[in-house]
Amino acid sequence: MERHLQILLYLEKRHFLVDMKNACQEFLQDVNEKTIRKFPPIRFILQVDVMELLDLFPDLGEFLIQEPLKWQSCCNDILFACLKCLDNDLTQMIKPTQVAVVIRLNSLPYILSTKQEKYKSIVSLCGLLVGITKPTNNVYHTVWSCPDECEGNEVIMHFIPKIPPKCYLCKSTLFENSGLRRCGDQVQATFKFKNILLPQSYTIVDDLISQLKVGKMYTINVVILKKLTSVWSIEESTIIPAPITTPVPSDIKELYEACNGLPWKFIYCLASSIGVHVCPLNCFMNVKINLLLSLVSVKANALTSSPIIHFLAGGFDTGYIAKLMGRAALLADSFVSIGTTHNSTSTALIGASGGVCVMPLPLQAYSQNQINSILSIIETGEITHSTYKSKLQCAVWAHGMDLKKIVLYNIGNIFGSVCRGDYGDFADELADHALEQAITPTTVGKQEKQALKDISTYIDLVAGIKVSLAENAEELLRLYFLAARKEKPKAVTIGNLGALIAACATSARLCRRNVANNDDAVFAIWLHVSGMPEPRFAPDDYLETPADMKKLQKVIEKFYNWLEQFIGYRIYETNE
């Protein structure tokens, strides 16, 4: 009785009792002596703010978390009492089982709920929604009668039992009055949970269905019953951008200061930590940098809805590219690899939401249906299924060996840009590295692991920065695009312009700036020119990636001078 009084005080304080009274009055207005004999249900949805409940009545909040079914039973008793208190003769014909309070939880602290599935208490699960079925009927009210017409022996149940109940008086098996059945809607929602191999499906009913969006992370609050799991509430998990005052890892802070905030130098050094033991330090830097930019863009897309940078590499041999992709994918929140036996690429892309979808094999190894499906999804930005539509929320990483130029250009137009794979530029360095690894194999040490951990932390810190382009940077990108388009119309397309802008903005984001300047624009252009198949716009000397920073600075300075001549625009005079 004490629990009833506490819940009653809470409902009164939050003005829920008034809402219950109004719901009861509306119910009685809609029934008469004839319809009341059909045992219609009265349902009331109670939205409980758990944080507020814990603040007002801590013991009551703890009771809700530990004993949710008893809490709901108390609410049912209170709603039935509200109905009985009304001055209406029809209330005498209403049974307690006709009354049901549907509890929906808001702001349930994840740290207070149980994470392991067990009876009684509320269990909170956090997972990625990867699929929804078509709506079907959800039976929430059934009436069972005695075939011998025993008086007053109707049984009201909120589900369809596997075995029909029996009459309390004559012990006959009851039959259901199918005309009195009440139904709502339900769907089967499939969630992918971290550290659990197989996805799990849950039944989502009525008002909760509208909250479901495929590809989003959700916190699901469930109550484990004997034969089923009841979902009480579902809330979308949103990532909050890190505050500006959040401390940066000390090593990255020192590196940024040593690089004077120059994007080409700072990002070059950051990207060099990817795949340290896969290839020599200065090999495939164009690939490493683009992988890093893609990782940042995925996280930024979740926080600021900025464009995602996809990754495509081409070359005579892309074996090292596949290894670098595998190492870089470990920095993402999640990643999914597509094999040649995947029948549905859309499922893999949805499963990779918030992370990256890696195609570890060359494009030639995949079926034409798989390639066409992925290209169509990247181009439209939508994943279409028979029962739902979802936005593409992951980056796609792919590579192809010995692709014809026209094929590479067409696919690169959809991906946005092309990275330079192995064209024999680093044959000597790779041979020496392979020999050294064979003689003295090395493993990833503590310093390498810490460096990658710092980069992952740094990506989380900068991803929430909203970036805009300065007028001069925007003009620089436009002039380069027009000049390059005039030089090679097939190699430079509209899709490349979007990738240039995204790379420029991501460069500024990595440097913790909310305005992209000319340095960011030149860096994005340098990446674009470096990744093109030969013959490239700029001389090879201007696109080298030496391990020495002084040599790299000379390369970038030469590229600045070449770019000014290529577009007829003075960069330094207007550099902000």
What are these regions (language model features)?
Residues 1-41, 310, 322, 343, ...:
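Long, intrinsically disordered, Lys/Arg- and Ser/Thr/Pro-rich regulatory tracts
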Residues 116-118, 264, 280-285, 448, ...:
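Conserved phosphate/pyrophosphate-binding and hydrolysis machinery centered on Walker-type P-loop NTPases
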Residues 1-202, 206-216, 226-231, 278:
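Long, low-complexity, serine/threonine- and charged-residue-rich intrinsically disordered N-terminal tails
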